[in-house]
Swiss-Prot record:
GO terms for cellular component: ribonucleoprotein complex; ribosome. This is Large ribosomal subunit protein uL5. It comes from Clostridium novyi (strain NT). Belongs to the universal ribosomal protein uL5 family. It comes from the Bacteria. One of its GO terms (biological process) is translation. The lineage of its organism: Bacteria, Bacillati, Bacillota, Clostridia, Eubacteriales.
Amino acid sequence: MSRLQEKYNKEVIPALMEKFGYKNIMQVPKLEKIVVNMGVGEAKDNSKVLESAIADLQQITGQKPVITRAKKSVANFKIRQNMPIGCKVTLRKDMMFEFADKLMNIALPRVRDFRGVSAKSFDGRGNYALGIKEQIIFPEIEYDKIDKVRGMDIIFVTTAKTDEEARELLRYLGMPFAQ
């Protein structure tokens, strides 16, 4: 069991039960999955770019990414239907907790002039989205080996019914929200 999962079981569940007055332990919101998505627009011209993005994402998450493809053809973006335009990874259970722990305690503090993540990026359904501008904040990525600085989107999907519950869940888990 990972460090974050133990913290969730021993500290977060009792704290949330007290704060929101849950009667049953199953009502307490929990992390369901984390989706890490990397949109690689340049992949339409050069397939090598997508391969290096996949390699980066695999190193960061420890899981093989799936290639995302264009749903429709868009002439303005010069893409056709089913062209590869990015990659994503869905993390659940142990891998999810390991990644969340690494993100909150190691990667985010390495961001330049980091003052905390926005507390407004909730979607109204208890999910939290976070954008990262460069992949080099993760310790697995070697600075000399990257071909291009790429960003990524990280979505925390929770079982929380409201944004307030999700915010408290992530705050107790150690997400550094800006004040």
